[in-house]
């Protein structure tokens, strides 16, 4: 992986471009400064950083280029337009390390090639259109730091499904800024480093904005869908779970029923600060929509999710029949076996009707 870095005032750095051959990128938190001057923490992603057609990139005389070696160490190869790698590009010593690639030989990690990004803990700013037209970006991982977002950061990122926050739900994070930049449905997972499972899973449904001008030249700004309201449940960049859960009983007819079913499922699956009243409301909706959840879980081949759904004990005979049909359609024998086993155990645990024998 090769990084183009723009030094900033205050001893920090902005990442302006990434090159490599892997669609899943884990960005470093800092790079070594030239001439042994310590390290530059990466605090910003530049405008159009991962866009296929970047605009306004700084010239080579303003940036430093780093290459990640096989041992993971970042090595400075070019500083402000000057090659500092110490390698000759044209050499007949075939045992010598290869010289740095020229710009026209580099493969940018951008656009439809990019699938996953892990942001460093040091990051504080994401520039405008950073992920513009990254149509296959499906997961973004961020740390505990608060974030400032530019405009249209995730424009046309239609495949983005998960925001993984490496923090506890009680901590102040950049989630408020992230979901505020996404109008499509997206899930946030609070998943601290080193833990086997998330602490909380929260869905943010899609919403639409409408601006209408009346004959009196008054602008009416309206929102369709509850997604906008879910995105406001933060205070000082900390999640407000009670306010989040209070939105569901207010109605969700304008929202995608499958997304709302997943919202209920994930809140019950990881019930962080979930009140009894909210739990009952989520269970009631989930009982009549288990098929929607199973459809998504089977498509993702999420066996652990199927097990979690069965553990909630919200499926009746009709739901099991629907689930068996969905598993057969998906050709998922493991899920079909799990459903059959859960149904058998539920029937065996049910109280048996009394029988009367008149054979004296």
Task: List PLM regions with ranges.
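Structural signature of tandem-repeat unit edges
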Residues: 2-12, 19-43, 55-125, 135-148, ...
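A short, well-ordered alpha-helical element
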Residues: 45-53
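Residue-level signature of the C-terminal ends
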Residues: 53, 266, 271, 300, ...
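Repeat-mediated protein-protein interaction surfaces in helical alpha-solenoids
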Residues: 265-282, 304-309
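Ankyrin repeat A-helix N-terminal signature
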Residues: 296-302, 326-332
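Ankyrin repeat structural motif
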Residues: 302-310, 332-341
